[in-house]
Curated annotation (Swiss-Prot):
It comes from Pyrococcus furiosus (strain ATCC 43587 / DSM 3638 / JCM 8422 / Vc1). The lineage of its organism: Archaea, Methanobacteriati, Methanobacteriota, Thermococci, Thermococcales. Its main location: membrane. The gene is atpC. GO terms for biological process: proton motive force-driven plasma membrane ATP synthesis. This is A-type ATP synthase subunit C. Belongs to the V-ATPase V0D/AC39 subunit family.
Length: 370
């Protein structure tokens, strides 16, 4: 073989190798670099989460005004400074809005290929507001007190607050995906709890649709996150339904599709004699540890312990994912769950202070909140 031919083959091979290396390098840069800045920022935010010691100090506030003052230098300070009064409702709204601020930030700083997920997550506040307004209208409570001023259709929600009848609310929601659940409620095809469940089911379906449009690591992480949330909702629904004696056939219809638990397991839970037997059906799923840690509580009729254990499981899984995929959307999801848990503890402290519970007892209770 002539030297020129060998040289040509070598040149062609080198070009192919360099092209492959360039392609792989470009793929890695496209895949991971967009997460460098947002995840560094989120790690800094994690460092500002309240320590257990800080929570114990807040438990000693004695007055709600002191509680607010003690959080002035935290990430909640901005929203708390806008309070109209030091009432439980106003403080809880400020804490909720602080959480919304977090999602809005992620929507802004995360890579474009996952921003849409946080946009859909924000729509949960539309669902919450609609459900809260409808509940208030039906029970005769002031609807405005239950509205969080945020959401894609906030103007419609405000119009709902002013509506005199459920029929007016239906007209306001005409053309949205929320029109049909309200129509079914008005026609008495579903009751209020079923209406609420249907509304949240629509939201989770939108999250699933978005997840299924992704690929690679993003799809893997987001899929586990959303399917775990759906599992949590379905498990809670079944256990509470078993405790209150809801019809099995009606319960099957209310299940949210898209979770990781198989239909056979869910139906076995529905067919179980009582909540404990239903919980036992989860022993061969990834929730075996949840079963182990909450069996005794369920025997005593306490379903909330299962819900706490499920939240803890999801939070731990996202933390593990954020460590395994340090340059991924898992970091944002893990932080979001930590923040949500922190707000849950803060709300518990607020209510207990308002109820004049002793600081020592508040510390005990908050330690149990998850």
């Amino acid at each position: 073989m002539e030297i020129s031919t060998i040289t040509m083959i070598l040149d062609t091979t080198l070009v192919a190798v360099f092209a492959w290396v360039a392609y792989k390098t470009g793929s890695l840069i496209w895949k991971y670099t967009p997460y460098s800045y947002p995840n560094a920022r989120i790690r800094a935010m994690e460092a500002r989460l309240l320590s257990d010691q800080r929570l114990l100090e807040l438990a000693e506030s004695k007055e709600l005004e002191n509680f607010v003052v003690n959080l002035e230098d935290s990430d909640y300070g901005k929203r708390l400074s806008e309070l109209k009064s030091y009432s439980v409702e106003e403080i809880e709204k400020a804490l909720d809005l602080s959480f919304v601020d977090t999602i809005l930030l992620f929507q802004k700083i995360m890579p474009k290929r996952v921003r849409g997920f946080f946009e859909v997550m924000l729509e949960e506040w539309d669902v919450r507001n609609i459900v809260n307004v409808v509940k208030a209208k039906i029970t005769g409570l002031p609807a405005q007190d239950f509205v969080i001023p945020v959401g894609k259709i906030l103007n419609k929600v405000k119009a709902m607050v002013e509506a005199k009848t459920m029929e007016e609310i239906l007209v306001i929601l005409e053309g949205t995906e929320y029109e049909e659940p309200v129509r079914k409620l008005i026609l008495k095809e579903i009751n209020l709890p079923e209406f609420e469940h249907l509304m949240y089911s629509l939201h989770y379906q939108k999250l699933l649709n978005y997840v299924n449009s992704r690929k690679g690591e993003e799809k893997v992480i987001l899929s586990e996150f959303v399917s775990s949330l759906i599992d949590s909702k379905n498990i809670s629904l079944i256990l509470r339904a078993k405790a209150s004696g809801i019809n099995a056939e009606k319960l099957k219809i209310m299940l949210i599709p898209g979770g990781s638990i198989s239909r056979n397991v869910l139906e076995a839970m529905i067919s179980a004699e009582d909540p404990l037997m239903a919980l036992t059906e989860l022993e061969k799923t990834k929730y075996a540890e949840v079963v182990k840690n909450s069996r005794e509580a369920v025997e005593k009729g306490d379903i909330s312990t299962v819900e706490k254990q499920l939240r803890r499981y999801i939070q731990q899984r996202m933390k593990e994912q954020s460590q395994f995929y340090p340059l991924s959307v898992a970091v944002a999801l893990s932080y979001m769950l930590q923040k949500e848990n922190e707000i849950r503890k803060l709300k518990a402290i607020v209510r207990l202070i308002a109820d004049r519970v002793r600081p020592e007892r508040i510390k005990e209770i908050v330690g149990e909140v998850t």
